[in-house]
């Protein structure tokens, strides 16, 4: 069965003024879609035919991994964002962030540094480790925490195509704007153990 491009969970213009309609049209409809098309061209006739996207990400390498992980990462990223979102988490997630980082402001500062400091194209992540603790991670290219057994909670796409139309080379300005869109309800669901299937 062929993989399909999941629709955005909101309208293309819903994240303005922080992320423009034009960026989402290119980022989702073209870049994300290209990874889906590539994956559908690469998988037939391989051991990965008939596997779920998550299974492919965890067990593949090379071109199949790169495209599968980028499909998964992008679908996860879209869900990490929402219109009229941002602010701070509450409840158990907020408690865990405070325990791991000292305060929400310290977490925000460290996550921002991790994302802005990712070398080249990649992703900044908040993950839950197997022991339940929270940690930050930076992955290069198509890197995905699923391959290390971590549970992704939040990601910021720092490939240039995520922000270049709106912010040109100013990655820090994009990451600053990202905080206005974080969908803490979704992040909390991941923290509480809801399994995300892209």
From Swiss-Prot:
PROSITE patterns registered for this protein in UniProt: SOD_MN (PS00088)
GO molecular function, a single term: metal ion binding
Top-level taxon of the source organism: Bacteria
Keyword check for Metal-binding: yes
Record InterPro entries: Mn/Fe_SOD, Mn/Fe_SOD_BS, Mn/Fe_SOD_C, Mn/Fe_SOD_N, Mn/Fe_SOD_N_sf, SOD_C_sf
Binding site for Fe(3+): 27, 74, 157, 161
Family recorded in the similarity comment: Belongs to the iron/manganese superoxide dismutase family.
SUBUNIT field: Homodimer.
Protein name: Superoxide dismutase [Fe]
Gene behind this protein: sodB
């Amino acid at each position: 069965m062929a993989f399909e491009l999941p629709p955005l969970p909101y309208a293309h213009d819903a994240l303005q003024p922080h992320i423009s309609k034009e960026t989402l049209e290119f980022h989702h409809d073209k870049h994300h879609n290209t990874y889906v098309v590539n994956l559908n061209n690469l998988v037939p006739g391989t051991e990965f035919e008939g596997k779920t996207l998550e299974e492919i990400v965890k067990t593949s390498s090379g071109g199949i991994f790169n495209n599968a992980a980028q499909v998964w990462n992008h679908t996860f990223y879209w869900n990490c964002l929402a219109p009229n979102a941002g602010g701070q988490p509450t409840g158990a997630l907020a408690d865990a962030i405070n325990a791991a980082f000292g305060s929400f402001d310290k977490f925000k500062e460290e996550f921002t540094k991790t994302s802005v400091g990712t070398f080249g194209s990649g992703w900044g992540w908040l993950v839950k480790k197997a022991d339940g603790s929270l940690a930050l991670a930076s992955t290069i290219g198509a890197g995905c925490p699923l391959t290390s057994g971590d549970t992704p909670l939040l990601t910021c796409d720092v490939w240039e195509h995520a922000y270049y139309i709106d912010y040109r080379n100013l990655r820090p300005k994009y990451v600053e704007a990202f905080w206005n869109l974080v969908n803490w309800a979704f992040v909390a669901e991941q923290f509480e153990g809801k399994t995300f299937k892209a």
